[in-house]
Amino acid sequence: MRVLYIHAERFSWESREPALDIRDEPGSGAAANALVVFVSVERGDSSDEEFLRRVARDVVETAEKVKATAVVIYPYAHLSNDLARPYVAKEVVNKLYEVVKSEFKGEVYKAPFGYYKAFEVKCLGHPLAELSRSFKPEEARVAKAVEERRDVYLVLTPDGREHDPAAYSPADPDLKALIDKEVFKRELGGGEPRYLDYLRKFGFEWEPMSDVGHMRYGPEATVMMELVEDYAYQVAKSLGIPVFKIRGTNMFKLSEKAIETHARLFGERLYIVESDTDLILRYAACFQQFAMAKDWVISYRNLPFGMLEIADSYRHEQPGETVVLFRLRRFYMPDLHIFTKDLAEAVEVSYKVHEAIFREIGKLGRTYVSLYNVTEEFYKSHRDYLVELARREGKPILVRILPTQKYYWVLNVEYHIVDELGRPREIATFQIDVGNAQRFGIKYVDENNQVKYPVIIHTAIIGSVERYLYAVFDTIAKAEREGKTPRLPTWLAPVQVRIIPVARDNLKFAMEVADKLEEAGIRVDVDDRDETLSKRIRDAETSWVPYVCVVGSKEEETGTLSVRIRGEGQAKMTAEELIKRVREETRGYPTRPLYLPRLLSQRPTRG
């Protein structure tokens, strides 16, 4: 923060026209014998109380030293080339004004933020009449860190007992890994994960012509992404409540109070876009769904209900922390918000969400260890609720108790798998939000015709689209470490069946079989390339195609296919039997068509 002090015999100001979308109400004023405090808020400054009290003490001491009877806080953007974002600067200036007002015995004024202003000043011209200052928040943060109450961690077992993580010896190695990472901040696992090799064959890769942390998705990756998106909607509907699927924008104005406040509560990693106004790229679907829900007329009879969007989401992760398919600056979130009457109903609905989260990861052959982030007040009043969730998990949970409510939630449950390298990796989540309905103006009318604000559950039951696929590939990596053949779930395989004609004469029959399979909703292609049979079979294996059918004259005559089943061996079956088998393996999952030309000869090869 840069500050210029002017001890003025007279000082007056008047707002003329708006300079920013984020601004105070217009105004004017005047003061005599005033210390005028021209303030430029810089990047890195914050509304941290200790920092602002340090600045305020200097303001008050200077005012008393020059015997000023008034102080004027004047937002002034021309003292620095490294200014904070307007929404940050406005908050810092306004809070500085409040702190100075509480500590200075004379009059304290503030010129409006966000305007072109006219001012007149008559400087008194003594040795202390013009002074400059520079303040850095780091010094205040160090002092505050000593005094600030730290988060408390404990292990809560299904029988309701609490344990100190330092003295607790978990039987579950996954829980131990979570405790080591979260409580003791130990670096876990090392080496190159296998899943990175898998991703290249399916077209999941960084986009070098974009910002750090942005991916591109080839045809195989795209069909897998869209299948997971479809499945996320299917899972949301399985909760047994009405779910409204929507679409919206990814940019929101920071000048909107609700957006600005929610962004501050989210914390760091905001993705800001500079335009003719400051815009924030959404970090989940919250902004759009809440902006839409506030315009709905909602009755208690409508609750609970959900809103789902597959939201392109943006988080400004550090460049060295981005990991393909896991930690990204841009990703796709099947973000479900469930609107409930009150906290009691939110608790009841959360049991369904919790059950669905474990059910879905169980379908991949995995389970979660859970971290429960909770405010101290909520833990004291709802401890039995957390014990019940632990009981439903059937194992101990790690609880982090925050002394104050720093975020928009009172409970945030993170569900972690432990990957092939022994590292906890958060996939799914749910949160209970008691403030955003009022912040955005989302209301409902209860049975007594009273206007109420719903309690909102935020959840990504299967995680982001990318993280769900990360869990799939990590599961395959673990299986391969155990000596098993790597294999995608059949419903997710970009190509479910490949037909390889032995000779050119067999191509017509191969296409007829492919037609039959395609009509049954199976993604099928035909390898008609002028390559040897062994190479084409090898390429199908490299591509992890679950079913590879080699058709020659014998198969044409008998109508029986020679099928290589990935990870199992060879079998003879008719096209109808193959269709039945694929349908059994994909029952309950969405389908999509092939996103590639059927004939491999028509496809460009990767460089």
UniProtKB/Swiss-Prot annotation:
One of its GO terms (cellular component) is cytoplasm. Homodimer. One of its GO terms (molecular function) is tRNA binding. It is found in: Cytoplasm. The lineage of its organism: Archaea, Thermoproteota, Thermoprotei, Thermoproteales, Thermoproteaceae. Binds 1 zinc ion per subunit. Catalyzes the attachment of threonine to tRNA(Thr) in a two-step reaction: L-threonine is first activated by ATP to form Thr-AMP and then transferred to the acceptor end of tRNA(Thr). Also edits incorrectly charged L-seryl-tRNA(Thr). It comes from Pyrobaculum calidifontis (strain DSM 21063 / JCM 11548 / VA1). Keywords: Aminoacyl-tRNA synthetase, ATP-binding, Cytoplasm, Ligase, Metal-binding, Nucleotide-binding, Protein biosynthesis, RNA-binding, tRNA-binding, Zinc. Pfam families: HGTP_anticodon, tRNA-synt_2b, tRNA-Thr_ED. The N-terminal domain is an archaea-specific tRNA-editing domain that hydrolyzes incorrectly charged L-seryl-tRNA(Thr). Catalysis of tRNA editing is performed by the charged tRNA itself. This is Threonine--tRNA ligase. It is an enzyme of class 6 (ligase). Zn(2+) binds at C286, H337, H458. Belongs to the class-II aminoacyl-tRNA synthetase family. Its cofactor is Zn(2+). Residues 193-489, 194-489 are annotated as: Catalytic. It catalyses: tRNA(Thr) + L-threonine + ATP = L-threonyl-tRNA(Thr) + AMP + diphosphate + H(+). Its EC number is 6.1.1.3. Gene3D superfamilies: Anticodon-binding domain (3.40.50.800), Bira Bifunctional Protein, Domain 2 (3.30.930.10), D-tyrosyl-tRNA(Tyr) deacylase (3.50.80.10).
